[in-house]
Amino acid sequence: MSEHDQNPGDWSDCFTIESGGESGGEPGVVVLRVHVQPRAGRPGVVGRHGDALKIRVAAPPVDGRANAAVVELVARLAGVSRSSVAVVGGRRSRAKRVRIDGVGPATLSAAIAAAVASRP
């Protein structure tokens, strides 16, 4: 059994805290590591991919459409506006770093756990 299986609600290894939010609940700036599968038949949060969150988007990786879909999905997941989310690394790669403003680490971890638990 891996350490992730022992505490499936802890997703803190998938992101880093850039500012604020050190106490866990207060909003701050978080950078989430994601592994993206473009052109997916069923978009959504999948689970872990190493130390990243694996997500699927329907958009193709052409003209930034997959990145825009990632921003929309992560904003919905974190409960923030799309303007609070930006791809800051890996724009041309499946492995991306996504900056989220205005979300606490505990809130983000709980949202990820709920999304993974509710997937079919």
Region roles according to the model:
Residues 1-72, 77-80, 86-120:
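Contiguous, often N-terminal, cationic amphipathic patches that form binding interfaces
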